[in-house]
């Protein structure tokens, strides 16, 4: 049965919720340094791009459920609408997962990244799962993001904004609504908050109660992340020791040793100056969460009106993005997102028309507020060199302020000889290099990267200094959706990017 329920949110529905929403004191945020205010490969088609709008889009009055008047793609059909309604009402009564003040703080920092004064590091699982939910996995992903951020911060000499694809990245769009194996055709797996990945009829039926479980898992993940961020686990000295260990045990350690030891020397100087491990600046960090805004009933149920500003915030995450398949100008997802005040991402591939991008940005950010829009580009190295410059010029010509981000994962999915999906580290590195090259040619700021990655020692992407081959893929291939960089590959990529940032910085200083 298709989604058609109507919802209304009220800040007075729960005494606990009311207290949380109207508390003017923001909860402690999750910068290590104080951030400024200022075999043959068989290509796989990664996406079916959104079709350009055929007519001019008229923007009517926005409301929490005005998206229901638009065409909604990629949403599941639940068999029992009343059961879904009951679950959504429960979610409405639950406390928000994040707070408006935190989202505003992230927007300010993303505005700095748009001007080249900060670097955005966004990473995490392709799709979070119920089965792999445990403290160690959360800790390991958080840890590798910390390690990467220190390397990038030293290379660029700018604050690093750390945003996880965590605590809500469950739902996944699919190019085909059905999957067929051995003549049996069932609905595709769309993420653990919708249905199960086991290939049987019962598992593939969308279950609204999975939304409650996803909410609870997100809340627990956020709780642990806050503890890690503020409880001493993020201490700079500790993170640097981890990086030195990586360098010493890497086959290409000599390549990164100089940078790692320079970071260690800088910390020694700071300690001598009084910034020891006990100082809050050295032991805590900021951290935010993000996910794709796909399952609109869930996102609506967690949207709250901020009493201090009168604006609506999607309190399921600090930042949400619209995907390549759901970014139609006259579609339901764009309609929902134009009314929430969170920082927003827009995923674009080589199929994005520059004029369409300008229109989309104008719909989502009519006030042209810095930090509001992040354009996440994913198109492969060759397309990046040909197509990106047209997008950059169009956006600049329209006077729009955006934060440009490189997603080198989705445009590089291939099929290995064994049949598993994988991504080659060399291709990922090539797309990052192309992203930097184009922005340097255009005089814009390439200070951001978006990765599907994990802190685990998986074998899902081939290559890297600790080489993963096609033959290795089956040994630790644990992803529920797309292949992820493992911890070693992720950190290696951060050293490569840091080297590029340092060269760019040194070159600009000589001018």
From Swiss-Prot:
Protein's UniProt name: Phospho-2-dehydro-3-deoxyheptonate aldolase 1, chloroplastic
Sorted UniProt keywords: Amino-acid biosynthesis, Aromatic amino acid biosynthesis, Chloroplast, Plastid, Transferase, Transit peptide
Interval spanned by the transit peptide: 1-49
Protein species of origin: Solanum lycopersicum (Tomato)
Any one GO molecular function term: 3-deoxy-7-phosphoheptulonate synthase activity
Function text: May be involved in the synthesis of secondary metabolites derived from intermediates of the pre-chorismate pathway up to shikimate.
Subcellular localization: Plastid, Chloroplast
Family named by the database record: Belongs to the class-II DAHP synthase family.
Pfam families: DAHP_synth_2
Reactions this protein catalyses: D-erythrose 4-phosphate + phosphoenolpyruvate + H2O = 7-phospho-2-dehydro-3-deoxy-D-arabino-heptonate + phosphate
GO biological process, one term: aromatic amino acid family biosynthetic process
Major site of localization recorded for this protein: plastid
